[in-house]
Amino acid sequence: MTLARFVLALVLGALPEVVXFDSVLNDSLHHRPRHSPPTGPHYPYYLPTQQRPPRTRPPPPLPRFPRPPRALPAQRPHALQAGHTPRPHPWGCPAGEPWVSVTDFGAPCLRWAEVPPFLERSPPANWAQLRGQRHNFCRSPDGAGRPWCFYGDARGKVDWGYCDCRHGSIRLRGGKNEFEGTVEVYASGVWGTVCSSHWDDSDASVICHQLQLGGKGIAKQTPFSGLGLIPIYWSNVRCRGDEENILLCEKDIWQGGVCPQKMAAAVTCSFSHGPTFPIIRLVGGSSVHEGRVELYHAGQWGTVCDDQWDDADAEVICRQLGLSGIAKAWHQAYFGEGSGPVMLDEVRCTGNELSIEQCPKSSWGEHNCGHKEDAGVSCTPLTDGVIRLAGGKGSHEGRLEVYYRGQWGTVCDDGWTELNTYVVCRQLGFKYGKQASANHFEESTGPIWLDDVSCSGKETRFLQCSRRQWGRHDCSHREDVSIACYPGGEGHRLSLGFPVRLMDGENKKEGRVEVFINGQWGTICDDGWTDKDAAVICRQLGYKGPARARTMAYFGEGKGPIHVDNVKCTGNERSLADCIKQDIGRHNCRHSEDAGVICDYFGKKASGNSNKESLSSVCGLRLLHRRQKRIIGGKNSLRGGWPWQVSLRLKSSHGDGRLLCGATLLSSCWVLTAAHCFKRYGNSTRNYAVRVGDYHTLVPEEFEEEIGVQQIVIHREYRPDSSDYDIALVRLQGPEEQCARFSSHVLPACLPLWRERPQKTASNCYITGWGDTGRAYSRTLQQAAIPLLPKRFCEERYKGRFTGRMLCAGNLHEHKRVDSCQGDSGGPLMCERPGESWVVYGVTSWGHGCGVKDSPGVYTKVSAFVPWIKSVTKL
C-alpha cells in the first residue's frame, strides 16, 4: 500500500481502533489477499447498516512505502486480430480500455469524487485529473504502472485493489471476417457471452466503435448451441448508440436462468467511408443470401415497395451487401410481410449503381403501398446446379440453363413434361409455368448439360429429378428447353399451365383428374363436370381424340385436398385454368365426387346381331385383362375384365334399383346366383332386374344394359334355414339367345365338368363384385385373387355346416385379408383353366364375418350341380 492510499484509508476510517498500526503495515507489505467483493449495493466508507466508529486519537505518522510493481496489461485479443496496437494511457489502462471499473477480483469500484479526503490529506501528482470526476474507472493517480481503485469491502469499509485492464474487453468470434461474429466479453479471467434479449443496432454500433471497426453496427443473433460451454455475463444491454465503450451502457448482470430464444448477441460492422449509403439487411430468408429488403433510415428499419422492382434493383442490393451470384427480385412479400414504415417506392436502378441510394426512386417515406408489396431479393451463389432462364424479356422466361463447372449450359427437351416445368418454376420462385417454343429465344452456343430429365413434381430443386449424367445427350440446341413461368395471382387464382395428371386409369389416357397446386396434388369435384371439361383436360395433356367425362369417383377416390369445384369449360380453352371461376380450395364435396376423364375415347356399343354368331359359342373368354390386381383385400378391376359379372338388382318405385347380389352370366338368357339372394324379397320376378356390362354402379356406360327377369329357379333342396344347396338360376326376358347382347364387355362364363375338382385342375382363382372393401361398399367392380383351400380347413372351422357341395377358399393369415362379403353374395368364384378359358367353380355363399383370420369363405361348388343347371337351362 502506498503512503497516499494508507493516509486516505486512515482518514476514511478504514482502519479500526483495535487494529495496531504495525499489523496494518505488515498486511500491506505482505500483500494480504483482499476480501471477497460485497454482494449488496456499495456506498463510500460504510454500508448503510453500519455506523462510522468515533475517532479517539489522531492517525500515526505515515512511513514511505514501496510502490506496487509496475505491470503493463496484456494486449487486447481483438486488437491483435484487427491489427491495432493499444496505446498506453499515461496514468491508467490502455487508451482502448479506459472504462474498466472493477478490481481484478470482481469488486465494483467506488467513484473517485466520493473519496474527497484523499485530495486534502495527500494529493497525488495526477489527482487534478480526477477532481470533480464522478466516474469509477480504474486509474493510477499516484503514478504506479498498474491501475487501481477504491472499493467497499465485505465489512462495509473502504479498501483498494488493482484492476485487470482486460476486464470488459470485447472480441468477435465465429464470423466470416473480422467485421462480424458473436460478441464475447472478458471478465474475471474468462471470456463469456451476452444474452441477446433487447439486443439492437444501437448496442451493436457501440461494439463496432469500441473495436474500431466502423461506426455502424447491425445486431445479429447466434444460437448458444454452437458456442460450447461458455458463461453468460450480461443481458438486457441498453446502449444509446453514442457510448465509447460497452461498459458505459446500462445492462443487467446475468443472474442465471434461461436466455430468451437461447440466442447470444452478435454484430456485423461496416465503415462509412465515401458516400453515405443506407444500411441494408435481408430478413425472413432461409439463408443470409436472401430475404425481405429492409433499410435503416432516421433511426428505424423499414421496407421497400415492389413497384418497378426488378432484377436490376436486386443486383444493386446484392452488390451493396457484398453478395455475389445471381441477383433476383422477389415481389408481393415473398419473404413475409415486414413491419414499420415503407421507406422507398418506385426504385428504378440500372444495375450498375454501388448503392440503392444512387438509384432513381421516390423520396424517403413517400409511397402508395402496404406491406403485402414488400420487395425482396436473393443473391444466389454460383454453385453447380444453379438454374436460370436466359434470353427472354425477364427472369420469368427464356431458355433453361444450368450452371456446372464454371459454365452455363442448356437442357435437352427429350421426355420433358409439365411436372419438370413446374419444378423449375417453383425453384425460381414462381407458382406455375408452361413450356415455351425454343424459337422465341436466341439459340445457345454453350454446352448441353442435361438430357432425359424426369420430375415427379414433389422435388424442391431441379437437380433432384432423375436425369442422365452431366454432358451426356443426343440433342442439338434446337431441342433446348424453354420455359415461361407465371406468379400466382390474387386470391390464389391460377395462371396457365399448372400440372395435371390422370390417376388409377387402365392406361395413361384415362383416370382421376388431379392437379398440383400450392405444393400438393389434389382432385376436382364433379359438380357440373361434363365432356367439355374433359376435352380441355385431354387437350392440355396432348390428346386430340374424343373425350368423355366420368363422375362419382369413377376411377376411385383420391387423397389430399379437393382443389377445384364448379369447373365451367366451353371446350375450346387451352387449359383447365381458363375454366376455373371459383377460388382454389373452395368446395362442398367429398372424394366420392372426384372427377375423371377418358381421352381418345372410341368406345361403341356392340350390336346384338354382329356379335351373335362370333361370340355365342364362346365362353370363359376375357378380351380385356391386364396384370393381376389383388371386395376385402381387392382393387378396382379392369373395365370389361370380367364380362360374365352381372348384378341382381332389387327394383324400386323410383326405377333405380339397388344392388342386391352378384351373379354370373352363363348364356345370353341365363344367370347363375345364390338361392339365399331371394330369401328376403321372395321369388316374384317383378321385384328384380339384372344388369350386365356394368362397372361403376352410379355411372351409365355404353356396354351396360338392364334386363328384366322372366323366371327364377331355386334348387328344390334349398332350405332358408340352411346354407346347403345355395344355388339358383335366373332367366332373363327376351327371345331365345337374344336376351343380353354380347360384346367385349358382356360374355358368358364356362361351366365346370360334373364333379370336377378345381383344386387339381384349376389355378389362378379370383372373386369379383361390388361388395365390402373393408371401409364401405364399392361403386366400382372389384377383384381379388384368392386361393382354394383343402376342405378340411372349413370342416374344422365350421364343423357340420360344411358339406361336400361346398368349396373352401380364402387366406388364413390376418395380413392377407381376402374375402367375398355381403354385397357379393351370389357372385362368381372364377378360376383359369389351362388354355385361358375361365370357369365358374363357385358361387359366393356364406362365411364367418368378413375377412376374419382363420375364417375362410364358403362357396357353392358348381361342379356338383352341373346336371341340374343343364337340365334347367338346356345348355
UniProtKB/Swiss-Prot annotation:
Residues 56-71 have a biased composition (Pro residues). One of its GO terms (biological process) is proteolysis. It comes from the Eukaryota. One of its GO terms (molecular function) is serine-type endopeptidase activity. Keywords: Disulfide bond, Glycoprotein, Hydrolase, Kringle, Protease, Repeat, Secreted, Serine protease, Signal. It is found in: Secreted. Its EC number is 3.4.21.-. Residues 93-165 form the Kringle domain. Residues 31-88 are annotated as: Disordered. Residues 631-874 form the Peptidase S1 domain. SUPFAM superfamilies: Kringle-like, SRCR-like, Trypsin-like serine proteases. The active site is at 676 (charge relay system), 726 (charge relay system), 825 (charge relay system). The record marks 630-631 as: Reactive bond homolog. Residues 619-630 are annotated as: Zymogen activation region. Residues 170-271, 280-381, 387-487, 500-601 form the SRCR domain. Disulfide bonds join 93-165, 109-149, 138-163, 195-259, 208-269, 239-249, 305-369, 318-379, 349-359, 412-475, 425-485, 455-465, 525-589, 538-599, 569-579, 619-750, 661-677, 765-831, 794-808, 821-850. PANTHER family: DELETED IN MALIGNANT BRAIN TUMORS 1 PROTEIN-RELATED (PTHR48071:SF18), SRCR DOMAIN-CONTAINING PROTEIN (PTHR48071). Plays a role in neuronal plasticity and the proteolytic action may subserve structural reorganizations associated with learning and memory operations. Belongs to the peptidase S1 family. This is Neurotrypsin. The lineage of its organism: Eukaryota, Metazoa, Chordata, Craniata, Vertebrata. The gene is PRSS12.
